[in-house]
Amino acid sequence: MLRRLFEKLHNFRLLPVFVIASMFIGIVIGKWYGISNFALTPPIDAIKSIFHGTYEFSIPNTLALGVVVGLFMMIYPAMANIKFEDLGKATRSPKQLFIVASFNYAVAPFFMLLLAKIFLSGEPDLYTGLVLYGLAPCIAMVIVFTYLSAGNGPLAIILVALNSIIQMILIPVYARLLLGDIRFDVWVVGESVLLYLGLPLIAGMLTRFLGVKRFGEEWFRKLKFYLDTMSIIGLLFTLVVMFALKGDLILEKPMFIVQLAIPMTLFFWIMFIVVYLTAWKSGLNYKDSVAVGFNATGRDFEIAIAIAITAFNPTV
């Protein structure tokens, strides 16, 4: 019976229904508890407080941990499906690396800045938030999207690793260039990489290596169904948490959503189509083109939130 329920989650025709339901549940939770009235705790700070023995149970802290748990549930299954030897092959992909680096650092931040100027010039907080969102390439969700789209998973991981290194150097430069004299701890980028990429990668690799070694490939093939299910549940759970964080604000100021949805939708559609076609015309196959497209399009909301909290007011 439980497996039948899980199989419904694998039906991609039903996925939009589950996504909308998760968003609705999140908004209801946010409205019920008035969560946006609380100070938002950065997920990494909540993790640190646990290790330091200073964690206090509260709605913001619990939701902060929910983001970490949800992202781990999404990324870990994708990592577990990666073979060590495939990672080695993916490192020998100079064309893919060049396309992603070019679009991520020569196009994406400035394209997002242009969209912010066009649609949000009269809303300084929303303008700043959107520009911040455009600075950092994604280091988590793109692996999940590549995985769900049957793209080249090992290549996606290598591209994410490249982005992780480059953005630690360039984000402070781009932030000052596009937003003026702002100050934040660049280590928030490194911490995000370790938490959202490093931890699931290690756990996934150990699961595959130790599981196959002890139980065999057939066991792992059976496990894959449940790993895929975990990834989808993680996606839905993360949506609930993210919409709960600002559920009451969404209902009070729905135009915020409309104002941000237009430039963000334009950004994602235009960027993905242009990058995918560039990769395709460059001779890459579907799997590589998908991995390149998502890696050059996805943005890192975790890093954007961390910078916004440390360098700007809560509205941003």
For each feature predicted by the language model, list its residue ranges.
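Alpha-helical transmembrane segments of multi-pass small-molecule/ion transporters
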Residues: 1-316
